[in-house]
Regions:
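Acidic/histidine-rich, surface-exposed loop or edge segments in extracytoplasmic proteins
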Residues: 1-7
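Metzincin-family zinc-dependent endopeptidase catalytic domain
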Residues: 11-96
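Structured segments of extracytoplasmic/periplasmic soluble domains
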Residues: 19-28, 108, 112, 129-132
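Metalloprotease/metallohydrolase-associated module, dominated by Zn2+-dependent proteases
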Residues: 65-66, 76, 83-87, 115-165
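Active-site recognition of the HExxH zinc-binding catalytic motif
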Residues: 94-112
Length: 165
C-alpha cells in the first residue's frame, strides 16, 4: 500500500486480496491457475498495489485518468478511490472490490476486455464494470456456477469520469 493513504487498513486490504484470489469462484476455481502469496522480498509474478489516484495515473501511463485501476506489466494497480468509494452503479462495495481485483488480475493473466453477452445476465468479470454494465448485472467472479463466464471480445466507448473520486 502506498505511503500516505489514510483510513484504509492495510491488513484488511491484504486479507481481502488473499480471500478474493483464493475463492473457488475466482481465477483458480477451475484449476487452470494457481496463485500463491509470497513474502515481500520473494520473487513474484505480479504484485497488487493500492495507490492514490495520482500515482495510479503515473503507474498506468495515463496521468489524466485518476478514476480507474489498471494492470501494467507485473503490477496490478488498485485505485484507492475506487476501493473506498466504489462506483455509483454497483451498490455492494464488497462485491465491487472483488470485481476490481479479479478484473485487473485477469489482465495480468492475459485476459482482455469483454462485452455483455446477454442483457439481464451477469457481466463477465472482464467487462469494464467500473465504467458501465451495458445491460448486464454486476458480477465479481470469473466463474459462475463453476464455469467460466465470458462475453464477446471488446470494450465499450464509455467516458472516464473526471476527478479522482
Amino acid at each position: 500500500m502506498e505511503d500516505g493513504i489514510r483510513n484504509v487498513d492495510v491488513e484488511r486490504f491484504a486479507r481481502d486480496v488473499a480471500a478474493t484470489l483464493a475463492d473457488r469462484r475466482g481465477w483458480t476455481g477451475d484449476g487452470r491457475w494457481r496463485l500463491q502469496r509470497v513474502g515481500r522480498d520473494d520473487p513474484a509474478d505480479f504484485t497488487v498495489l493500492l495507490t492514490t489516484p495520482v500515482t495510479r495515473g503515473r503507474l498506468c501511463g495515463d496521468p489524466s485518468d485518476r478514476y480507474t485501476s489498471c494492470r501494467n506489466g507485473d503490477q496490478v494497480v488498485i485505485n484507492v478511490a475506487r476501493w473506498v468509494y466504489g462506483v455509483p452503479h454497483v451498490t455492494d462495495l464488497s462485491r465491487y472490490r472483488q470485481y476490481l481485483l479479479n478484473h485487473e488480475v485477469g489482465h495480468r493473466l492475459g485476459r482482455g476486455h469483454e462485452r455483455c453477452p446477454r442483457a439481464g445476465g451477469p457481466a463477465p468479470v472482464m467487462v469494464q464494470q467500473t465504467l458501465g454494465l451495458h445491460g448486464c448485472t454486476p458480477n465479481p467472479w470469473p466463474l459462475v456456477g463453476g464455469e467460466p463466464l465470458a462475453g464477446p471480445s471488446g470494450q465499450y466507448d464509455d467516458p472516464i469520469p473526471a476527478g479522482d473520486r
